[in-house]
């Protein structure tokens, strides 16, 4: 896709808007509020936001990080989501060959971000969003010939289904083996990788391949290591680290193409 300043400016506006919208939906989900039935509002005083207060990034700065009505500090996560939204839009644009790839990758990034935020708060994710991200990846890499051969168990081809299922099986065995080693002398049942992590990594393997998914898993483990060492007795949400590792890997792919 063509690279020019106007395109990147439009992408910045689109990404920041989607980031703000994504964070709003995530916060409503975490607060058990209606997702789409209400206009945007302050989560402290519940005052509906005016149009100028909805402008991504600039409204956060002009309001001096506080609600105009109740003066309660606006969560930094809102601003961060808008900035990350711009980055997601640029990444999706630079890695896409056509509009279809751009839409798939952009939705994948934002749904993964929403899942990461929810995982941070609840250390659990909704099944609907989890399987949505898998089917987004599936629809992106879908091949009718591969699909047919996979279900008749003949002539397996190196496509989404094979890569996703092999990596899911690999993670399942790895997860249980680590749990076995960790709990060898105890009767505690603890798991290191959750089912959500396996499904998301399997979807990445289906699109980018086994090796790429393994690199993302390895990088996520490295990123989580300092937090794990610092908070040994605290249960750690791993999905945000997978998200960060995935974004880093995509940036690496962009840099590799530019060099």
Which role does the model predict for each range below?
Residues 1-259:
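A membrane-topology feature that recognizes alpha-helical transmembrane segments
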């Amino acid at each position: 896709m063509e690279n020019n300043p106007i395109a990147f400016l439009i992408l910045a506006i689109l990404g920041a808007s989607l980031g703000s919208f994504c964070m709003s939906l995530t916060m409503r989900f975490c607060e058990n509020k209606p997702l789409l039935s209400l206009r945007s509002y302050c989560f402290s005083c519940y005052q509906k936001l005016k149009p100028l207060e909805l402008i991504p990034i600039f409204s956060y700065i002009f309001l001096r990080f506080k609600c105009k009505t109740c003066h309660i500090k606006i969560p930094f996560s809102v601003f961060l989501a808008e900035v990350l939204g711009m980055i997601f839009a640029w990444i999706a644009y630079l890695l896409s060959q056509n509009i279809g790839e751009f839409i798939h990758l952009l939705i994948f990034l934002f749904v993964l971000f929403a899942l990461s935020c929810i995982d941070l708060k609840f250390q659990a994710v909704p099944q609907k969003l989890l399987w949505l991200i898998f089917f987004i990846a599936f629809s992106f890499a879908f091949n009718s010939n591969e699909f047919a051969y996979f279900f008749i168990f003949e002539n397996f081809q190196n496509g989404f289904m094979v890569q996703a299922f092999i990596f899911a099986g690999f993670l399942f065995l790895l997860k249980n083996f680590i749990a076995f080693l960790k709990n060898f002398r105890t009767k505690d049942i603890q798991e290191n990788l959750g089912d959500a992590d396996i499904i998301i990594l399997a979807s990445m393997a289906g699109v980018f391949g086994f090796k790429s998914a393994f690199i993302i898993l390895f990088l996520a483990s490295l990123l989580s290591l300092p937090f794990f060492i610092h908070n040994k007795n605290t249960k750690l949400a791993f999905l945000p680290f997978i998200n960060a590792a995935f974004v880093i890997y995509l940036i690496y792919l962009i840099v590799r193409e530019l060099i």
